[in-house]
Amino acid sequence: MTVQTAERTITLVQAIWPKLRKEAEKQCEVNPWLAKDLARKILSKKTLRESLSCVLALPLDHVTGSSESMENWFYSILGLNDEKIIRSAMIDLDRLYTTNPACPDLISAFLSFRGFHALQLYRIAHGLWSEGDKTSAVLVQNWTAVAYGVDIHPAASIGDGLFLDHALGIVIGETAIVEDGVSIWHNVTLGSTFKDSGARHPVIRKNAMLCTGATVLGRVEVGENAVVAAGALVTKDVAPNRLALGSPARDVGPVPQYFGALTNPNCTNK
């Protein structure tokens, strides 16, 4: 991470918490029925870390049986590596809000979008895995799969600013690498071919897009800004800035301009 990128990230994290609180206060005025829920998740919290811990723990109550203990546990994990997970989460949140036309405001992205929640639970599991607590990491992986239908192995390497749209039926294998700014739709699989050991899952480069039902198998590379079309089966590399279509997938030309709002990190729908 460059110094400029680090500074932008710090500015982003500092700006999001007061904005979330302001939007929560406004929503309490618009709909007083939500005041208790918004107080529980945001307005009663002193920090973004406290709030995110609560938001992630509460939907798991039916799985774990104790959202309060999960909230405290998640709070401790979110503090690992100088709150690196928090920084990644806020980059994810900003990407979701700024590029998704279906997301009306920042508080909706934070409270209601399952892709954001599932991704942060992966980040918690990955933090545990990296600390050597693999059993706990796999438990969080399982809870996430049960609650959200998203199964990301905690050893997978995932960058910042991901956009998981709908977040149903997503599977990402143990040795997969997903770089910054990637967009993934529902029912996408990053799997192995069962013929390899070691690094056996795909590498998805920056700002690539994997559309609904795409399957990418083996240690193949989807290049930067490339798009894998809906239902495509990829078993060979996809070059940067190219569109792969079909089963088996084939290169059908450059990525059309209308994909730019999601493949170009500088584009926005807001």
From Swiss-Prot:
Organism name: Schizosaccharomyces pombe (strain 972 / ATCC 24843) (Fission yeast)
Similarity remark: Belongs to the transferase hexapeptide repeat family.
Cellular component terms (Gene Ontology): cytosol; nucleus
Name recorded for this polypeptide: Putative serine acetyltransferase
Pfam family, one: SATase_N
SUPFAM superfamilies found in the cross-reference section: Trimeric LpxA-like enzymes
Main location: cytoplasm
UniProt-listed Enzyme Commission number(s): 2.3.1.30
Record field: catalytic activity: L-serine + acetyl-CoA = O-acetyl-L-serine + CoA
Keywords: Acyltransferase, Amino-acid biosynthesis, Cytoplasm, Nucleus, Transferase
NCBIfam families registered for this protein in UniProt: EPS_EpsC (NF041874)
GO aspect biological process, one term: cysteine biosynthetic process from serine
Subcellular location: Cytoplasm; Nucleus
